[in-house]
Amino acid sequence: MINPSHETAIKWLQANGNRKVGIMGMSTAGMDSLVAASYFPDITLTFALTASDFVWQGFEQGNKDGCKEWPIPETSTLSWKGEPLPYMPFVYEHPVYWQKIEEETKGSGDIERSTCLFIDSEKAREHTEEEMIKVENIKGKLFLVGAEDDSFWEAGKYIRRMDQRLKERPHTCEYVPLVYEHGTHFVLPESMLRMALPVGLKFVLRFIFRAAKEYPKECEATRKDIDKKLSAALKEWRAE
């Protein structure tokens, strides 16, 4: 939700000695980060990892009729000032939504695959301009990071579309599109992942993602490159 708490957080940071405000998010939070940065010009560094270039229909996770996730009818994932943002509706409703995930996941080698939800929903109808994220409004520095072998959605394609959108529209941000052949959905900096999982990182990744099992060296190289690039960008941004 893009709500007053974002603005409150920015003002609090600035009032407590922070000259600059940055934002970082991965997966659904990557989309959230992009939207927030497009609304708040005080955000001058954005790291969007595996982010989509559009807002999605809302969804819930838990247990409903044997399903672990389901779409919420006529609901957006994000809102602004109490009003839902336009969104791409999923072509599948409950319970078919989760059944499609199960079908795609079966025998894939991934603990979960959901690319069909997004591919089929995009085929069912063209995106409206209203539901696309206005990345051209983002200020400062913008890093768009994703991998072609993402098992959740087509992160690489979304980054290329944002790249094209920025080429076609006036913007002031300095942006860097980073699309890797191998990296899985977890295109996090290596050091950050190791903080979260100091022991057994490679085992966990191989258990979750087939690509991490088949291309362990390439995926690790991707994470280390991301670490290097984002760390350098953060250091430069802080020094400006």
What are these regions (language model features)?
Residues 138, 144-146:
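Short beta-strand/loop motif that positions the catalytic acidic residue
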Residues 140, 154-168, 192-193:
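Short alpha-helix in the alpha/beta-hydrolase fold that links the catalytic acid
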Residues 16-27:
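Alpha/beta-hydrolase fold nucleophile elbow
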Residues 47-135:
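Accessory cap/linker subdomain of secreted extracellular hydrolases
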Residues 30-41, 46-47:
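Short glycine-enriched nucleophile-adjacent loop
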Residues 1-16, 35, 227-228:
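Alpha/beta-hydrolase active-site loop
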Residues 160, 171-240:
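C-terminal catalytic histidine-bearing segment of alpha/beta-hydrolase fold enzymes
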Residues 149-153, 184-187:
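Acidic catalytic loop of the alpha/beta-hydrolase fold
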